[in-house]
Amino acid sequence: EGEKAGTGRLRRESLELVTCCSDFLKDAYNPKAYLGNDLKEIKAGIKENFKNTSRFTLVEQPTTAKFLLEAIKLLDSNTEEKILISEDGLDTLVNMAIGSPGICFYRLLGNKDLAQEAATKFCNNIFNRRYNAAVIDILYNKKSVQTYFKQVIDYCVMGNLQAVLDEFAYMIDERSNGERNVEMIQKRMIESFIDRNYQEIDTTESFGKEKKKKWRIRTHYAMPYGNIRMTDQATNRANDVRLAFNSPFRPFVLASTSVGQEGLDFHWYCRKIMHWNISSNPQDMEQREGRIDRYKSLFVRRNVAKFHPETYTWNEMFDLARTEAKDKGFCELVPYWSIPQDMLKSIAETDREYIESIVPLYPLSMDYDRYRHMKSVLRLYRLTMGQPRQEELLESFKDMPAEDIDKLLFNLSPIKRKK
């Protein structure tokens, strides 16, 4: 019953299969060599290489996780024994080479024990939950315990799990592959596989009453951050949620307040912020956006990746982008903290990435006037701090006479030449 409901759908041989670390499958696919190729071409190339090894004999037989595990053990051994396998089984091995969790972690970490542990916790946390299993059932329009492991592997291939893990590892440790601390990377990744969270809610019958009958609901994809009663347990839980949110995995929505958020960063995998209310303090609004507008934030990385789609490693992409920024005369904050419009011109306008600040304004609400006033105050606040946004700076000058604008400018050059 539990398997059908989604819990424990990956178990025994199927879990061992998707988390196995095979040298043969790891070496069968080199992401850098296939960079820019169509997925169909990549699969065809790997499959052709498999057939050229003369290790396989195609037969008609069902593809089970137990059989594939035995085949992989033979492939990793020195024996030349022929492996009887079906066309479907060969396709599954191809998919495993590209995106199986065990192979992807092994390719990244280069250590079987670390990769096996990380992949097992990843699969148990992501794919052995009923709500995630339901997503895959809907996506593949099939609910079967026997073929669930194939769907999981294909799902990881379609989502390019290898690229996801590579980017996450880069954010944890920016050094080149040979210099990285793989133990630290593995530990930080495991910390992001957060368990289910429970949230107490009021019912319509108990709302506003002193004696409340509260219900506990599970929260998965959206979670609250922080707690009014910051006990040690609540503090630890808040830290776990923060680490999970700063990862490519759930939760994808974080509900928080402005209180006590100074110094906290949520920029690794977030570029949108929705303001539930409009603060009267411009510094408060600035600090809210500052949580996701920081060093190598998500919108920065996405733009840098679009500058050089032919480049494989993140270090190389940022080095090339920095060289371009230097040639254009930009300071060393570019492209790590921000990317000027002049550099974004090389990207199609519809593909450019920005920080998105969403303010819901309801009809006939006083928030309309309050928001207009706040934008005006924010422009002046940034001017005062010496960090204006170009579009806001131009907006403040739009209705001013030219002679008044000249009075606001001052010359910082060492020699002032009069006309």
Briefly describe each language-model feature range.
Residues 1-254, 258-419:
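Helicase-associated low-complexity regulatory tails and linkers flanking the ATPase motor
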